[in-house]
Amino acid sequence: MLEFFSRLSLVTKIIIAIILGIGVALLFPTVTPYLSLFGELFIKALKSVAPILAFVLVLSSIANFQVGHSANLRPVLLLYVVGMLLAAFSAVIASLSFPSTLYLNTVSHNNLQAPGSLADILKNLLLSFIANPVQAISEANFIGILAWAIGLGLAMRHSSDTTKQVMQDVSHAVSAIIHKVIAFAPVGIFGLVAVTFADAGLATLESYAQLLAVLLGTMLFVALVINPILVGLTIRGNPYPLVFKCLKESGITAFFTRSSAANIPVNLDLAERLGVNPSTASVSIPLGATVNLAGAAVTITVLTLATVHTLGIHVDLATMIILSVVATVSACGASGVAGGSLLLIPVACSLFGISSEIAMQVVAVGMIISVLQDSTETALNSSTDVLFTAAVDIRSRQNS
């Protein structure tokens, strides 16, 4: 029995865990307090690895970022950045239009205050930026972690290849630890679902359904509206034939593999069939799998604003714009690790003074809905890589 269960995919295990958790909560509610330990251990493990994960992934991503391989690379990068920002903005609008409420254990966290004026927010950001790096990691100050990771990453871009390889190896090592933690996700989610449904009842299903609807709806909006607008402006023509071809041949594969990296060969093959210059595609598509993560920006923004709404924190437009930028930067570090976008949510939550403990509960909620969220996110991310690469190549051929 155990051998059969071990052979199942993580998605299947999580689905089974959710069903069992709901069943136990409804049939044996008196047992659920004893199951809370599983959820607490899972959240504690996530809370422990998240700071070093954010630091190493962003540092390695920036240190190994190379520009100048192709004349067409700069406009592709511009599309990547603009696309992620617009995806984050779309997530803000969707979250404001359809606010979601999460079931969180907020006992002893009722002293949270709304951010003050824009000047206060910027002041707090600057103070967080210059925090001691060791202290930032130990206290889970994700803004400080992000600042040091970006600064050191930029400084190390001109270091030797050996140093960069060491950073990549460290990143892979941290990712390996994350994979071990994520492997226990079904057990943790079982405990979390059982306790949550026992405490909140079937109303929890409605909450998760709305959250999923906002997430998936925003990603579809990005794929079918935002991306076509950007591509249409680039190629100066009807973008939808190219958009649908990329979604069909790249997005569907990525949906089931749930890995942008694993989908790189699919994208390279599609780019070749679309007649894209190999010197451009060979760089921009692997690079896109690392830094072009519009779906991750949507996930980080939606879940953060759902947390803000749940805690009753009022935020103004300026703060939301800052959140969109932070979500975009954080998304660049989410590649290559299971649940990467979810594990970078604390970076965005720290903007609003939300504790790491609550942020990790939000990550756990994200894990519960990740069966659909992660697949759709990967489909958007990976199909966008080849879409923008092909669009820029078409534009360059038009100009030649």
Swiss-Prot record:
Main localization is: membrane
In terms of InterPro entries, this protein maps to:
Na-dicarboxylate_symporter, Na:dicarbo_symporter_sf, Ser_Thr_transp_SstT
This protein's species is Acinetobacter baumannii (strain SDF)
- Give the protein's function: Involved in the import of serine and threonine into the cell, with the concomitant import of sodium (symport system).
Q: Which GO terms describe its biological process?
A: serine transport; threonine transport
Supply one GO CC term from the record. Answer: plasma membrane
Q: What family, per the record?
A: Belongs to the dicarboxylate/amino acid:cation symporter (DAACS) (TC 2.A.23) family.
Subcellular localization: Cell inner membrane
The record lists the catalysed reaction(s) as: L-serine(in) + Na(+)(in) = L-serine(out) + Na(+)(out); L-threonine(in) + Na(+)(in) = L-threonine(out) + Na(+)(out)
> What GO molecular function annotation could you give as one example from this UniProt entry?
symporter activity
Protein name, per record: Serine/threonine transporter SstT
Q: What keywords are assigned to this protein?
A: Amino-acid transport, Cell inner membrane, Cell membrane, Membrane, Symport, Transmembrane, Transmembrane helix, Transport
| HAMAP family, sorted | Ser_Thr_transp_SstT (MF_01582)
Q: Which residues cross the membrane?
A: 14-34, 48-68, 76-96, 136-156, 177-197, 211-231, 293-313, 334-354
Q: Which NCBIfam families does the record cross-reference, listed alphabetically? A: PRK13628.1 (NF010151)
Gene3D superfamilies per the UniProt record, alphabetical = Sodium:dicarboxylate symporter
Topological relation to the membrane, as annotated: Multi-pass membrane protein
